[in-house]
Structure formats: C-alpha cells, structure tokens
Amino acid sequence: MPEGVPCGRRGAMLNVGLTGSISCGKSTVARMLEGKGAFIIDFDRLAHDVEEPDKPAWRGIVDTFGPDVLREDRTIDRARLGTLVFADRRKLEKLNEIVHPAVFEAWRRSVEEIRGVRPDAIVVSDFPLLIELGKQNDYDVILLVYIPPQEQIRRLILRNGYSPEEAIQRVNSQMSIEDKIDFADIIVNNAGPREQTQAQIDKIWTQLLKKERLQRKSAASSFQTGTIHKEREVG
C-alpha cells in the first residue's frame, strides 16, 4: 500500500474507484450509487476547484498554454483548452502534469474529511484516468462503467454536438475501454436502458455493503489482536 494514501484498507471505510472512458456514463452511475448511500468524490469537480483563478494549477495552465485559454472572467475555458490538448498528446500530458498533483491532494483531503464524519462510509471516487495513471492500488474495489466504442462515439455526437471526426478523436485520445476491462473488479454495462443500469447498481450496492462489513470486522479483529499483543508485552 503506497504511503500517504487514505485507503479503506486502513480501517472500515470502503474506497471504490469508479472509472470508464469518455461518454460511458460514469456520472449517471455515480448518482445512482449516491442515491444508495455512497459518498461521491468527483475528480472533474476537484479539477475545476484547483483550476480557479490564481491557484497554482491555474497559473501553470496560463503560463503553459497562454491567456487565450481564459474567459473574460479569468476562469479557464475548458472547451478551448480541451480542443488544444486533445489534438496533441504531448500537450495533454503537460496539462496532466500541472493539474494532477493538486487534484490528488484535494482527493486525499476529501477522503479524510469523510472518514472523520463516517468511518464506515462507502466512498466512490469518479476518476476517469484511474487506470491510465496506475492508481488501482489506492482503492479497495475498481468499478468500470462500460459501453462499446461505437456507442461512445454516437453519444458524443448526440450529447456534445461533435462531428464524427471530432468524436473519434476524443475517443482515440484515451485508453480504449476494452483495454480497461482486465483492471476492473466489477463491470457495469451502461449500454442499455437506464432501468437495466439501475438494476445492476442495486445488486452491486449489496456487494459493496457486504465487503464494507467484512472489512470493518477484519479491522476490528486486527485492532483487538494488536491490543492483546501489547498487553502481553507490558506484562
């Protein structure tokens, strides 16, 4: 376990990494899990927060990509920035180098805040680049939201108004959804009607509750064993 990671394995909290690829419906699944009782940490929202005007990540973006990526109110124009970086993998990597350290620190703080309120919480982190960045070991469960690549493209065209070429470029700029399957503990097929996805989430939530209870029981047992060992040493 990497040092400094606020992972559920340290206690009863269950840390779930929710991932997928562009237009797969991670936010929809996150809302369903929130409705069941999960605490949600949205990495896109964290990125927005750390990119607020005059914060270090904001300054790094402006220094690297120029003032043209700013709106009149000095906030980042994410659509314009996205057009720049998704057309050039090196620029995308540079953006990630600027933003990710601040986002990960904000995530750690969020997890610890939840732990302080609900030590037995099920925390779901909506993290698009979880697998690409090799963060699997930060989580107790990896939950992958899946739709076929052609459905990704279709949804991008309908939802975002992209041309077919733009949609294909966005999909190809990321790790293939098919390549992510082997990294997942649980897969949600989100290609069908919403009701089918909800039915899957209902079953998955039962699994997560069971895992959290087992983890809590294991943590309590470990604590008791440690206490006994200490008492023997004192004696």
From Swiss-Prot:
Residues in the signal sequence: none
Main subcellular location of this protein, as a coarse class: cytoplasm
Example GO biological process: coenzyme A biosynthetic process
Record bears the keyword Nucleus: no
Subcellular location, record wording: Cytoplasm
Gene3D superfamilies: P-loop containing nucleotide triphosphate hydrolases
GO terms under cellular component: cytoplasm
A molecular-function term among this protein's GO annotations: dephospho-CoA kinase activity
Chain residues that bind ATP: 23-28
Keywords associated with the record: ATP-binding, Coenzyme A biosynthesis, Cytoplasm, Kinase, Nucleotide-binding, Transferase
Pathway the protein takes part in: Cofactor biosynthesis; coenzyme A biosynthesis; CoA from (R)-pantothenate: step 5/5
Enzyme Commission number(s) from the entry: 2.7.1.24
Chain ranges of the DPCK domain: 15-219
Catalytic activity: 3'-dephospho-CoA + ATP = ADP + CoA + H(+)
Stored Pfam families: CoaE (PF01121)
Enzyme class, UniProt record, top EC level: transferase
Protein family per UniProt: Belongs to the CoaE family.
Matches recorded under PANTHER family: BIFUNCTIONAL COENZYME A SYNTHASE-RELATED, DEPHOSPHO-COA KINASE-RELATED
NCBIfam families: dephospho-CoA kinase (TIGR00152)
Function: Catalyzes the phosphorylation of the 3'-hydroxyl group of dephosphocoenzyme A to form coenzyme A.
Protein's name according to its UniProt entry: Dephospho-CoA kinase
